[in-house]
Amino acid sequence: MIRILVSNDDGVNAPGIRALTEALAEIATVMTVAPDRNCSGASNSLTLTNPLRINRLDNGYISVHGTPTDCVHLAIRELCDGEPDMVVSGINAGANMGDDTLYSGTVAAAMEGRFLGFPAVAISLNGKALKHYHTAAVYARRIVQGLLAHPIASDQILNINVPDLPLDEIKGIRVTRLGARHKAEGIVRTQDPAGKEIFWLGPPGVEQDASEGTDFHAVAHGYVSITPLTVDLTAHRQLSVLQDWVDKI
């Protein structure tokens, strides 16, 4: 039987991870290990200064007092009964497109699976009301089945974004590149009940590059977006340019 490790960054009780676990349980044995709280924006952070505490829940899930990356690392290295065939992260409550991927704990959980040598997928639901987790779950299952039947290059993860639409309104799947957002909106300055000054980070900026071929464009037009992401952050095209510059200094 195929074994799949599921995690997320919204927390073990989030509706997205329940929808994903239930959908994948139709095709595989699923182990769900996720943070015990919302860890959105955790990126690839690891907990290095405190122990990781777990709680085995009545539904079979395991919650971890740690980050999404902690969850995947701990599950694969210690908690899983045998290695998983794949790591799937999500379904995130909100998009992970463009620059979002650098901050996303959802994407980071999948990346950790890839770091440890396993095929990995991150899936997110794009919208405000977020009513259609079922749609995202159906596409997650379809794509996972496709990967199991027809494996692709092992040096990448698939970052999937699904419009928050009924299943029959999805137009199809498009392979995309990452778009880009403007910088985040301003900091919100306020006070706590004791009068102490506090700050809230502003929301993400609007799309800067949402042209045809990007994840933003595909999702806005009713398509599921699939973007291949690599762990290697090297700007390969700039190596020779940088070498020429180094030779001059």
Curated annotation (Swiss-Prot):
Cofactor: a divalent metal cation
SUPFAM superfamilies according to UniProt: SurE-like (SSF64167)
Record-linked Pfam families: SurE (PF01975)
Gene Ontology terms: cellular component: cytoplasm
Main location per the UniProt record: cytoplasm
Catalysed reaction equations from the record: a ribonucleoside 5'-phosphate + H2O = a ribonucleoside + phosphate
PANTHER family the record matches: 5'-NUCLEOTIDASE SURE (PTHR30457), 5'_3'-NUCLEOTIDASE SURE (PTHR30457:SF12)
Task of the protein: Nucleotidase that shows phosphatase activity on nucleoside 5'-monophosphates.
The protein's name in its UniProt record: 5'-nucleotidase SurE
The encoding gene: surE
